[in-house]
């Protein structure tokens, strides 16, 4: 299992909400073309201007396809809203489930 995590800090809660509404409308359509991929978005009440997105992939090819879709469809919005962005990509090394 592979993952990619984006943590974006926006100047305001409103900009974060706007960005998440863009993600909701775009990804609900775009993700259909890449089966077996999981997208989750998280926010907390304590820091509502921070959006965390976690992608999970079963293989490197799916990850590559999503990264291209991000470049083609999402980067223009992050360039306009200009959040501070941190990202992480990696392979799962441990997994526990109860």
Kindly give the residue locations of the regions a language model identified.
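Short S/T/G/P-rich N-terminal loop/turn motif that feeds into the first structured element of a domain
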Residues: 1-72, 79, 85-98
